[in-house]
Amino acid sequence: GSSQFSAIGAVDSPVIRDSYTDKPMIPGSSFKGKMRTLLAKQYFRTAMLQEHNADPEIVLRLFGSSNKNAIRPSRLLFSDMFLLNEQELKAVGIDSVTEVKFENSINRLTAIANPRQIERTIRGSKFGLDIIYNVEEEKEIEEDFKAIKEGMLLLEYDYIGGHGSRGYGKIKINGLKVETAIGDIDSKVIDSCNKILKEV
């Protein structure tokens, strides 16, 4: 969620919404950024993460680099994710696709309370995920997809957005399918990539 202002009685941290439908959405940048960070942690040989232009080669290959001496475009393009199953949720008696959770932190020294309201999407919400993979080296496709699979599995164990240590932002990724959008790729390679992503 975001917290640009906090009026009396208002939600302190509202969810991000699609300005066209006013429904919750997940920015592609949030998904991409978290997946990149988790993969960098996984592949780094040091205890501390470095700045993103120093990421391991496989991560730079997939997510790009802005290093002025070695600019690399991202092979992965992430679209924003929009709510898919609002009608399905309403059919089981759910009136709103978001809920507001009231939380309260208390200062240990002063005992002063700090109540706040955090909006979140309800459990069972489904969002559409579209990722474009740009082929640069055909021999690297399967290796790249193994890293993509690993990043998605890491995301399922982690979270997207804020307050993850309190259970927010848990996701499950399923129904992944690889298709050729432009150009010709060997069908055996496509089948192999689909097999890899079935492990998510």
Predicted regions and their residues:
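RNA-binding basic/glycine-rich loop and surface signature characteristic of RAMP-family CRISPR effectors
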Residues: 1-106, 110, 114-200
